[in-house]
């Protein structure tokens, strides 16, 4: 049975290969692209990280010097260096311009950091930090002026499986990107308000709003996918949130709730490209 270190190693390498798949594939030539293909992809990743290949039969056709030579040539081509499809490079160049697009795609190719939001209905930041320290999880407060003093996210220093922790199971915190934690405060919510989250997804922002509202009032969370709303309901139960109800976002449901809320949150679906840091496989599916 694999231990935590083994799982992190395997998962990290798989994500790396998925993220840089096109770049790695472009370094292969001839028979390398058809014979023991996945071994060849692994070999490229191994070589470009500076390791020596083991003397395995599957690597017999791989020449490290050739791989490095082709790599140096290919990284002069942005779509290969960034390991993105042609269509994505064309759209990015058109919308951002060359200089900004290169910054953007470089950022999207970085591994995403992990942030958590303290559930103020159950805990304080200091308590969560103390509990996590006892569970061997190191954190630091995000000291950014964009966040209120009481609303600062915690950054997880070393990526680990947080869902197995007692503090997570007890609903003391939620995993949520730092940028996402900026949204709910902008609504200037007050306890007792009626709020509609019309593109709720799995409910990260709805749960945050419930905390700001001190679990008083009502939040109607809507989405087109029932499975996401089911996950929201599970998260709400764990967090001790009682004011969220869910509904499939149909035309009838929208008309029924027309002009009935104090606040409306629309985190509308967009290109979906912002997920590439966490889900690099998305660029091969769009």
Residue ranges and their predicted role:
Residues 1-286:
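S-adenosylmethionine
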